[in-house]
From Swiss-Prot:
Source organism phylogeny: Bacteria, Bacillati, Cyanobacteriota, Cyanophyceae, Synechococcales
Assembly and interaction partners: Tetramer of two alpha and two beta chains.
CDD domains per the UniProt record, alphabetical: Tryptophan_synthase_alpha
Gene expressing this chain: trpA
InterPro entries the record matches: Aldolase_TIM, RibuloseP-bd_barrel, Trp_synthase_alpha_AS, Trp_synthase_suA
Native organism: Prochlorococcus marinus (strain SARG / CCMP1375 / SS120)
Name listed for the protein in its UniProt record: Tryptophan synthase alpha chain
Length: 267
């Protein structure tokens, strides 16, 4: 089977001796136009793949920082449709692959097939749906793949081994390894068992492994690279920088942080 755009991205960063840098931002925080500027800036400052969150009112997997960002985005009128429309306008300006991070409820409300069609037209490369159980991924995966979208599945430290094997073999693009038990958020240290989980996933499939939830600084990026991960996903720490930025300086602040993180990808 031909490799996907995401898999090619991981191959490229590996060739360069780097771990892929994968920042996450919440679309519409503070508004969709600023999100568009931030996406362009992140690509400019070294992002290999960007995760774009679609705001939802009940984000079970997310900690307080991302929950607040989702609230701000919803209050500014952001919807799945407005996110995809914004993404469409960037097709000629962005070449970095975009993964849409959405919960199953907004996806089902939109219509699974319609969402995949519109996401693909808007130029997205993949989807992450954190609350979709493995047993329900088959239909979405087949629709997504038919529209050239990878459906990325998540593995947590609490996932039983046999289930972990199934997830890693069914995940497309990469396997999303959740580094901690619980919700997204900044952590001061990463647990050593993340390394064991990376090794276990390596034994199950050749799909790249990206680590997220709790990666918040250059030290963590270096750590997961040494542990053998293919990608480092940085969410809450970046979302916090954006929310703390002076109005009009959000893209600038995001770019500075991305530059710092990028330097760590080859260490």
């Amino acid at each position: 089977m031909e490799s996907s755009i995401l898999e090619r991205c991981f191959s490229q960063s590996k060739k360069e001796g780097r771990i892929a840098l994968m920042p996450f931002i919440m679309a519409g925080d503070p508004d969709v136009n600023t999100s568009a500027e931030i996406l362009i800036m992140l690509e400019k400052k070294g992002a290999d793949i960007i995760e774009l969150g679609i705001p939802y009112s009940d984000p079970l997997a997310d900690g307080p920082i991302i929950q607040k960002a989702a609230s701000r985005a919803l209050n500014s009128g952001t919807s799945p449709k407005s996110v995809l429309e914004m993404l469409s306008t960037l097709k000629t300006k962005l070449s970095v692959p975009i993964i849409l991070f959405t919960y199953s409820n907004p996806l089902l409300n939109y219509g699974m097939e319609e969402f995949c069609i519109d996401a693909s037209k808007a130029g997205a490369a993949g989807l992450v749906v954190p609350d979709l159980p493995l047993e329900e991924t088959e239909k979405l995966s087949s629709i997504a793949l038919s529209k050239n979208l990878d459906l990325v599945l998540l593995v947590a430290p609490t996932t039983p081994k046999e289930r972990m094997r199934k997830i890693s073999q069914r995940s497309n693009g990469f396997t999303y390894l959740v580094s901690v038990t619980g919700v997204t958020g900044e952590r001061s240290a990463l647990e050593n068992r993340v390394q064991l989980l990376i090794n276990e996933l390596r034994g199950f499939s050749s799909t790249p492994v990206a680590v997220g939830f709790g990666i918040s600084d250059t030290k963590h990026v270096i750590q997961v690279k040494r542990w053998g991960a293919d990608g480092a996903i940085i969410g809450s720490a970046l979302v916090k920088r954006i929310s703390n930025a002076t109005t009009g300086q959000e893209a600038e602040e995001a770019g500075k942080f991305c530059s710092e993180l990028y330097k760590a990808t080859s260490l």
